[in-house]
């Protein structure tokens, strides 16, 4: 068998990568895709970093684990087959039951694997156990990474980063801080792995993945909230608090959990004073309004709201950065926050920058609106449903803020103008996203923007 680097270079990366759901270059023209680093983890398993360049001059690096000549689970054979190189066939190893177990074992033993392209270092967290004999399955969640679940005994989930870059990964960083501080509202970090490139300083190492405790028997917040909305809509003669699926109690407990996480991050990593990020939100508003004609009628009012806060002093700290109901899980014991990676698509420096806790609060409040208004996308003229949706939103907003206030001593509603500004900034971001990816959902953020700019 040829060297790992030689074989990896012969795989048809330019054809395979664009078919993957975690590939971020769909709106750009691919110029080239070729391995930039290859490290053998064992004889038939290689870690490959694929360097992708685009005709607009931008570039990205993706992680793919390649298993040679061993087919994946049959249902994933088309998705996982990268292609042929000489007389060998390469597969995305995460869809093969053996390879994820190898990765978990390497983390458990804090192993090191090297080649001329780099050194891959695996590290287990102190005093943890990994389910080495558990059968892995790839999560079907739509996301920018690939997660493999080991659901047996001390269950774990291995998150393999796909688009990678050097520097401290905020998901690893904050999970480690919160776990070592024994905060009950995060899944405990079990281990990590990263690659160091020859000639680069240690701090330039590139994080590649992390294993955390798996929240077995957990329900996603989004699924719970949307089920509650469906129950309310089905009971036309009952108020929200009278419906069996009322979510307000969970919203209050979620507010308490978010406040707890914020308190731990402030205690462990500190706080500072800053001014409201007017330049940042105005830049987003300008670029989004230029791309979304439906937003332009509100742009002037939004700009006025932002500019009024130009001298506003705010307390900043490390926060989740992209909090919504899809980033929280309800276990039998409590709410758990996951995916501390920050806002998708932002540079690492910005994703690790301190921010106001109100950004996370606004993210949850915006998510309540999505949960309630989502069913109205196909019933835009149903005023009764719209009124029911607003009732549900108001009840759950109130419950969440009350829970946050009870746990932290600070009621987000006391910072009314700031909170509204963070909600507006989030809704502007959503308008840009929906315009590009789900035009039918664009009315959801626009409805909220109309409400926020009218008050």
From Swiss-Prot:
Superkingdom assignment: Bacteria
Entry EC no(s): 2.7.1.175
Entry GO MF terms: ATP binding; kinase activity
Catalytic activity, as annotated: D-maltose + ATP = alpha-maltose 1-phosphate + ADP + H(+)
GO biological process, one term: carbohydrate phosphorylation
Keywords for this protein: ATP-binding, Carbohydrate metabolism, Glycogen biosynthesis, Glycogen metabolism, Kinase, Nucleotide-binding, Transferase
One Pfam family this sequence matches: Mak_N_cap
Coiled coil stretches, renumbered: none
Pathway: Glycan biosynthesis; glycogen biosynthesis
Entry annotated with the keyword ATP-binding: yes
Assembly, per entry: Monomer.
Biological function: Catalyzes the ATP-dependent phosphorylation of maltose to maltose 1-phosphate. Is involved in a branched alpha-glucan biosynthetic pathway from trehalose, together with TreS, GlgE and GlgB.
Family: Belongs to the aminoglycoside phosphotransferase family.
Name of this chain's protein: Maltokinase
Species the sequence originates in: Mycobacterium marinum (strain ATCC BAA-535 / M)
Organism placement in taxonomy: Bacteria, Bacillati, Actinomycetota, Actinomycetes, Mycobacteriales
Annotated gene: mak
